[in-house]
Amino acid sequence: DASCLDGIRHPAVKDAAKQIAGRFKVLRTVIGAAEKSLRNLLVDELVEYLSSIGVNYDFPPADKVTNHIRAFEDMMAAFHAVYPDQGLLVVVDELLDYLRARTEKGEAIVLDLSFLREIGEVCKGLNFRFMAGVQEAVFDSHRFQHVADSLRRVKDRFEQIPIARNDVKFVVAERLLRKTADQLAKIRDH
């Protein structure tokens, strides 16, 4: 939201952030070691989050859906009835660990990747955005060669933003470990 802008020191980043500040409701979730399909994990998280912000929507059961795009369109219609001027951003962490575990489940990962592909399609036409954190270039990983075709179709629908080690070092040094003058004085005195 706009109140977070004061914490941004880099002028270009701050200007870019102003354009979207407060324009999205944000669901952040971490996928743990789960047996559920990616579809069911994300749908359950979405339904719970939407309910917590006053949006009433239930996805149809997985066995009744032939394409999730219509379900997302209906979800966003319900969302916009309550928040007409905002979008919905879903941020998922640890997606790579989840997908790695799913590679051993045969066709399960293909269904998960198909669901991701549908999410990518939805993002193009709705005020819905999806962001996932992975620790390696999953689209080029040898671990997923057996589902390379499915991965390619997912890749075509998402923009990748690689983060280099130098980027991580910068964030740690400038954001996490940076000290104020008062903090530095206390450290020196100690």
Name the predicted role of every residue range.
Residues V30-I31, P60-V65, L99-L111:
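Flexible beta-alpha connector loops of hexameric P-loop NTPases
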Residues G7-N40, D44, E118-H190:
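Conserved P-loop NTPase catalytic core
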Residues G54-A77:
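Short glycine-rich substrate-engagement loop in P-loop NTPases that contacts/grips substrate
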Residues K14-A17, D74-A81, Q86, E118-E121:
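Generic recognition of flexible, low-complexity loop/linker segments
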Residues E104-E118, Q145-H146:
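Substrate-gripping "pore-loop 1 plus following alpha2 helix"
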Residues F79-I109:
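Conserved P-loop NTPase "ATPase switch" module shared by AAA+ and STAND
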Residues S51-D58, A81-Y83, L89, C123, ...:
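Hydrophobic/aromatic interaction determinants used to assemble and anchor large protein complexes
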